[in-house]
Every structure is written in structure tokens, then in C-alpha cells.
Amino acid sequence: MPLSGMKRKRSDETGRRKRSSGVKQGRTSAARAGSAVRRTRPSLQIQTLQAAGTSMIEVPSGGVCDLLGSFSRGSDEGNRHTNETVIYKVALDYHFIATAAACKYSSIGTGVVWLVYDAQPSGNPPTVKDIFPHPDTLTAFPYTWKVGREVCHRFVVKRRWTFTMEVNGRIGSDIPPSTSCWPPCRKNIYFHKFVTGLGVKTEWKNTTGGEVGDIKKGALYIVIAPGNGLDFTVHGNARLYFKSVGNQ
């Protein structure tokens, strides 16, 4: 019994010495030497495509198809610095205005805007019917269009939106009689979309241009079509957030 009591005393004294020293067993300075260093990601590049004045986009019945991401080779922020680019985000801020010819009638139409990926560009910009083949009898109803079965391996719809425009038979220069007023209609509309998570990769040829003919693989188009034949013009900005990747 006395021996066992002495053993407990020694173990208690050892524990007190360990606690008073403040050193944790099994920990070394090497554990802290490999602490992670936070790295900041480089900012995305930005290209702004403006439609205003003489560069406004005219959208006739049947629609239009334009290239997004026309990155020419260069050193500016809006240029591609390598032969590969990746579009991550797109911000659309457009104002649609019905033409005077369309305003002469009283009508309502549902138009459509698409973002379309082209996996295998042919060197020439595609037409709307190349992507969405349809009979002429469905030209006024773009919400019924589908990607052609023969080209579904090439064209992929990334985003699709609809919008409504109205005209009431009056143009902007008309003046109502003093005894009446004309109710407003949606012949001028604001179209805003912010798209994330696109990840559209484009491989460019060994050229300096930024057109469809300079693309080897992967292109992004915007397709706009009016509903019920209500032609309009597009004013505003498309902003693309992208990166130049790969080798110089």
C-alpha cells in the first residue's frame, strides 16, 4: 500500500510539471511551416459591344444573328492575349424601339432572344434559318422555332428569353386630339439580362482578327427575332466577361 501511494504521487507531480510548462506534446513548429498562402485570382477581362447611332441593330421579320465575343488579338483589356478565350458572363442592357413602319398597325407580338453556342463554325456567320430552320409561315412566331435536327450537334442554345412588344397604330409624331388621349403601349421596352456560368471556350486561328472567319472552334452568337412581324431597332450595350487562357 505505501508503494502504490508513492507511485501516484510521482505521476501527479509529473502531470503538474507538464501543465505548468505549457508545451503540448506531439506538436512541432513544422506543423505551422506549411500553412496555406491565399492567392488572388486575376480579374476577368471585359469587352463592351455598343449598339447606338449608326451601330444600332436593326431586327427585321425573321430575326438577326450576330457574333458575341469578337475578340481581336491585342494587349488591351477587351482583346484576346492568347489563342484561346473563355466567356464566363454576359450582361445585356438593351432598349428595343418599334420602327415607324411597325407602329402604323395595332398589334402585339412575342419576340425571342437566344444565346447560341456554335461548336464548329464554318468560317461564315450563320443565318437564323441555319440554326432554326422553319417554314415561311412560321416566321412571325419565333417562339415556335427549334434547333434543326441536322445541326443539333453543332448549335446549342445556352439561354432563351421572350419579350412582348405592342403597337397601337400611332407613330411618335402623331398628336392626339385635344378632347382625347391615347393609352400607352409597349412599343419601347427595356431588355436586361445578366448571365453567369456560361464557360464558352473559343479556339482562335493564328490571325489577329476577331470575326467568325478567325475562329477555329467554339463561337457564341446572339439571335434576336421579333414577334408577329413587329420590326424594331436595338440600342444599348452587351458586356462580356472573359479570360485569355492557354499559350501565347
Curated annotation (Swiss-Prot):
It comes from the Viruses. The keyword Flavoprotein does not apply. GO terms for cellular component: host cell; host cell nucleus; T=1 icosahedral viral capsid. Keywords: Capsid protein, DNA-binding, Host nucleus, T=1 icosahedral capsid protein, Viral penetration into host nucleus, Virion, Virus entry into host cell. A motif (Bipartite nuclear localization signal) lies at residues 1-28. Signal peptide: none annotated. It is found in: Virion; Host nucleus. One of its GO terms (molecular function) is DNA binding. The keyword DNA-binding applies. GO terms for biological process: symbiont entry into host cell; viral penetration into host nucleus. Homomultimer. Interacts with the movement protein. Binds to single-stranded and double-stranded viral DNA. This is Capsid protein. It comes from Sugarcane streak virus (isolate South Africa) (SSV).
